[in-house]
């Protein structure tokens, strides 16, 4: 039974109906690989949404970075509001892997900061895969890393059912074994508390509490409860509480793992002793024996992931179980921007192994640590049964898997043509660019400028700023979420120009951009290859007046091919518009904060409030309007006001002032409705 309910204010048109028909037919007939070659702005995501809806398969949509994954997730959530569209990326805000530098005899311990909200979204994804068929998981490459054992994770779930008698002490022990902790004062995700005949649990996979009401040993009621106000949100007949961590090891398996680790330790110590590596042997023995004691006493140790092979009972060299193994057998893989994502997949394993080998050779880890790894590319494709590659510029590897065949989608639903390409000499390019920027700024349009080096981007940004241009610089040191904010500020008109090096390409949805300027377009190389040029030019393909300026003194082969392909598409698009009487019109895509509000990455403190820098911004902007009528607030002030009121609501609840908290909650609800109506 197909449970997907696709909701969209428009029907497929242009090339979309034919592309959908061919892709669906390929999936239903068991085709292993298919490629959708879709030009920028032709609605590839909508096409894929239709394919998922018509095939009814659980789907994994793979993106090559967090920013694009967030954008895709938001778009798919809009198309499937009644289905489970989940988000799965690395949960590290900061990650420094364990490493050793032999030249300087420097050991670097692993340090990491885990983002609780992303961890919750990851748990939500695996829970949905166990409980529903209508699931779309949008993930980054981190999904190919080990994620426990799905069968053990499912088996460890603690089940409650209304009318059933339970042994409360036994159930509490099960929660503790599943890495929940008891805290009778404050309950958050991963904690539980018991007061009289009421057990409350903060599940790892959502921000609602589960309340189990008992009458003696019998479960009398199961409810979802608002953690702030205590309001009952929903009553249930039964519920499964999944473990607080994905890595679940039963007691009997832990004992056999400890035995296997001891055996491997002895073998490696004998090897080091035979080779005369006494320092390495002493180091390994000391570290491993300490870890074994920790595992024996508390079931956990620092760096426990390095013993994953033994803890999961895998054979040496066997692939780890990852997110893919949580999917049912008939799932569908969609690889977005495949020309970038596939090479990433193929490179992850080798980079991981080179670091691990140094640690093993110098006695910091046992050889089995090498099996705590991402999937090899061949292991990944073996687990993937049916794949759709999506790209405006598919790589040769993807085309080879499809025997050179692809499904083309060139016509935009808006009728907008590919950008006009204008090649100009590099002499005087900066002054020329400045005049073009001023023309666009007067029309309230946006400009992207891409340079070859970081230094050039910095210097250009300084020059434009000195000439009273509202400009920002996007570079690799900016965190993913700040990057989303910068891109959104560009769309909202906070500034007119965005300068970058290699960050202004795949997947950025910027309908307000009418001009893309490529400096030094004739410098042949990765950043000015045919595929890179087509992708960069495509950033102006959503605007009716889209233009790509290429500053160059020579025509390279890459430039010729990119220009030729763009002209080919323009010819097809122009002919289609003439035949069908279509006049190009703006995309009119909403500017929204949904990505930022959806992620909420590192914006909250451990106590649950907003980050200090954001609080300062919110305080400055909203102190004046907190006391005024909500109807007097400007639309752009509403998000900040809502966040400020949420802080006050949580503070009121902590002080047990539930009446004020409830009033604030109702006020927030009305403000959200007002915001939704105007978006």
Curated annotation (Swiss-Prot):
Keywords for this protein: ATP-binding, Cytoplasm, DNA damage, DNA excision, DNA repair, Excision nuclease, Helicase, Hydrolase, Nucleotide-binding, SOS response
Gene transcribed to yield this protein: uvrB
UniProt binding sites for ATP: 38-45
UniProt remark on domains: The beta-hairpin motif is involved in DNA binding.
Subunit structure: Forms a heterotetramer with UvrA during the search for lesions. Interacts with UvrC in an incision complex.
Biological process annotations from GO: nucleotide-excision repair; SOS response
SUPFAM superfamilies, per the entry: C-terminal UvrC-binding domain of UvrB, P-loop containing nucleoside triphosphate hydrolases
Ranges for domain UVR: 639-674
Species of the source: Prochlorococcus marinus (strain MIT 9301)
Domain Helicase C-terminal: 429-583
Reported function: The UvrABC repair system catalyzes the recognition and processing of DNA lesions. A damage recognition complex composed of 2 UvrA and 2 UvrB subunits scans DNA for abnormalities. Upon binding of the UvrA(2)B(2) complex to a putative damaged site, the DNA wraps around one UvrB monomer. DNA wrap is dependent on ATP binding by UvrB and probably causes local melting of the DNA helix, facilitating insertion of UvrB beta-hairpin between the DNA strands. Then UvrB probes one DNA strand for the presence of a lesion.
Locus of motif Beta-hairpin: 91-114
Pfam family, one: Helicase_C
Taxonomy, superkingdom: Bacteria
HAMAP family per UniProt: UvrB
UniProt family annotation: Belongs to the UvrB family.
UniProt GO cellular component terms: cytoplasm; excinuclease repair complex
InterPro entries: Helicase/UvrB_N, Helicase_ATP-bd, Helicase_C-like, P-loop_NTPase, UVR_dom, UVR_dom_sf, UvrB, UvrB_inter
PANTHER family: UVRABC SYSTEM PROTEIN B
Transmembrane segments: none
GO molecular function, a single term: ATP hydrolysis activity
Official protein name in the record: UvrABC system protein B
Hydrolase recorded as keyword: yes
Domain Helicase ATP-binding: 25-176
Keyword Cytoplasm: yes
Compartments it resides in: Cytoplasm
